Curated annotation (Swiss-Prot):
It comes from the Eukaryota. Component of the ubiquinol-cytochrome c reductase complex (complex III or cytochrome b-c1 complex) that is part of the mitochondrial respiratory chain. The b-c1 complex mediates electron transfer from ubiquinol to cytochrome c. Contributes to the generation of a proton gradient across the mitochondrial membrane that is then used for ATP synthesis. Belongs to the cytochrome b family. Heme b b566 binds at H97, H196. Keywords: Electron transport, Heme, Iron, Membrane, Metal-binding, Mitochondrion, Mitochondrion inner membrane, Respiratory chain, Transmembrane, Transmembrane helix, Transport, Ubiquinone. Pfam families: Cytochrom_B_C, Cytochrome_B. One of its GO terms (molecular function) is metal ion binding. It is a multi-pass membrane protein. The cytochrome bc1 complex contains 11 subunits: 3 respiratory subunits (MT-CYB, CYC1 and UQCRFS1), 2 core proteins (UQCRC1 and UQCRC2) and 6 low-molecular weight proteins (UQCRH/QCR6, UQCRB/QCR7, UQCRQ/QCR8, UQCR10/QCR9, UQCR11/QCR10 and a cleavage product of UQCRFS1). This cytochrome bc1 complex then forms a dimer. It is found in: Mitochondrion inner membrane. This is Cytochrome b.
């Protein structure tokens, strides 16, 4: 008699995705982040659902409803801080996941990679709209500044911004629609994640060496389920340390002041996970140019497969490309730091240099180093 997990239509899908899935025998801890992202998504949906039960999407009551959640709702404070800091953990895992894909050449699975880029954009949009909901000073001014960037689009820009706002400024209509989108987008993300997995399981996972591993596969369960649970324990430990000891570490103090359209904060900045893109935006004096650079800073990931010149897929045995990759990581950290600094000398110059370096590494130096390494192989 066939095992029910192999014969039942629904159980069969789960079995082929998480139990009997053939996985390379040598994948490292860098392959944990996919499952951690799934856990983060479930955590965000659950905590978000409980927050939505008590939150009111109205400019008059939004700020006080968040205060009410923290003060009066049973364990409301922990739900709120798990949701806010869960977003930070989500982005840490996302950046690690994308970085691993770049380092080990996983972008050669073009369908999986492109769905991943779409997922990244969707998660960023969701996080941005979520940041607006508490209706603090930084929420309001962040929403005003970022949505106003669309006015740089020729001809339709101003109309588009007013259409998104639902009026002539960020107001009740904006908050209501942002809440609606913030609620629905995680479910769209879940569907996209399922498609992401579907495409991945068509090709099978990549591995650190970058070579075909069909001759050396092991079942996903118990080997990688145990490995993923270890990663999950580390994630929960980090999240709970953040939530229970310093829940406001990654937030902005300005967001504890209710939104006031008549008083602009001295320095408007988004959450830390957008600072690298914000620094690139600010490094270009022209508004439209800045917006294009902002979009391209993420969209550039889509052309990485086209710029792969090396004969080897992974960077595991390519020391020059490895150096360049870690330069890129350092550059992104510098951009993140600059994004949180005021617009003054020397931060402007550092931001411009770091932005030029970012695009140069990805568009020019990576392909050149790949070609050089091909030549070195012939020596």
């Amino acid at each position: 008699m066939t095992n029910i997990r192999k014969s039942h239509p629904l159980a069969k899908i789960i079995n082929e995705s998480f139990i009997d899935l053939p996985a390379p025998s040598n994948i490292s801890a860098w392959w944990n982040f996919g499952s951690l992202l799934g856990v983060c998504l479930i955590l965000q949906i659950l905590t978000g659902l409980f927050l939505a039960m008590h939150y009111t999407a109205d400019t008059m009551t939004a700020f006080s409803s968040v205060t009410h959640i923290c003060r009066d709702v049973n364990y409301g404070w922990i739900i709120r801080y798990m949701h806010a800091n869960g977003a930070s953990m989500f982005f840490i895992c996302l950046f690690m996941h994308v970085g691993r894909g770049m380092y080990y050449g996983s972008y050669t699975f073009s369908e999986t990679w492109n769905i991943g880029i779409l997922l990244l954009f969707t998660v960023m949009a969701t996080a941005f709209m979520g940041y607006v909901l508490p209706w603090g000073q930084m929420s309001f001014w962040g929403a005003t500044v970022i949505t106003n960037l669309l006015s740089a689009i020729p001809y339709i820009g101003t109309n588009l911004v007013e259409w998104i706002w639902g009026g002539f400024s960020v107001d009740k209509a904006t908050l209501t629609r942002f809440f609606a989108f913030h609620f629905i987008l995680p479910f769209i993300i879940s569907a996209l994640a399922a498609v992401h997995l579907l495409f991945l399981h068509e090709t099978g996972s990549n591995n650190p060496s970058g070579v075909m591993s069909d001759s050396d596969k092991i079942p996903f369960h118990p080997y990688y389920t145990i490995k993923d649970i270890l990663g999950l324990l580390f994630l929960i430990l980090a999240l709970m340390l953040l939530v229970l000891f310093s829940p406001d570490l990654l937030g902005d103090p300005d967001n504890y002041t209710p939104a006031n359209p008549l008083n602009t904060p001295p320095h408007i900045k988004p959450e830390w996970y957008f600072l690298f893109a914000y620094a690139i935006l600010r490094s270009i004096p022209n508004k439209l140019g800045g917006v294009l650079a902002l979009i391209l800073s993420i969209l550039i990931l889509a052309i990485i497969p086209l710029l792969h010149t090396s004969k080897q897929r992974s960077m595991m045995f390519r020391p020059l490309s490895q150096c360049l990759f870690w330069f890129l990581v350092a550059d992104l950290l510098i951009l993140t730091w600059i994004g949180g600094q005021p617009v003054e000398h020397p931060f402007i110059t550092i931001g411009q240099l770091a932005s030029i370096f970012y695009f140069s590494i990805l568009l020019v130096l990576m392909p050149i180093f790949g070609t050089i390494e091909n030549r070195l192989l012939k020596w």
